[in-house]
Amino acid sequence: LALAVDCNAMHVYLDPFEGAKAAVAECARNLACSGATPIGSTDNLNFGNPHNPELFWQLKESVRGLAEGCAAFAAPVTGGNVSLYNQNPEGAIDPTPTMAMVGLIEDAAHVTTQWFKDEGDVIILLGEPVDAEDALHGLGGSAFLQVLHEQKTGTPPRCNLETERTLGTTLLGLIQSGLVKGAHDCAEGGLAVTLAECCFSELEGRNTPRFIG
């Protein structure tokens, strides 16, 4: 079995429906990167006061996004938890519909880890790196904007569930055919952070910093 837990609260704050779909899709990507196929999920919904119309809308749209995502990956929600009224005098927390998804690895030989294995191996990027129509080139709702520019703004990446499902199926096929030694999903921090994380091996951690240029 494999387990993934994901949610980008900033993306959900800016677009609850797309952000919630993306949380499900990221779980499925992480499972695929481990060599697993999704079989079920559970949620942990953390929101503010639902009597506030805007916050209730966040909850409603998030649940709609989770439902579409789980249906797309055939990962039914078997249970969950809801926590409301999460706020202080300054306002409510960012809506955080955290998803946990479990997957099945049919053959132990297909268990896949994230780090690079051998010098000279080819690095392949599956999927489009950024939406060509995005004026912020993928930076909408990013930690870059929030930390360096103190802005919670922009349009987070759109989540095409059909594309995500195809990506997962393709990756699993590559893993099961023995063509992939390691896999890691590209999420918070973008490609640079993903590549850096792929350098961290539990076996050779002391040697990996030299790979980071």
Segment roles from a protein language model:
Residues 1-213:
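Glycine/proline-enriched, intrinsically flexible loops and inter-domain linkers
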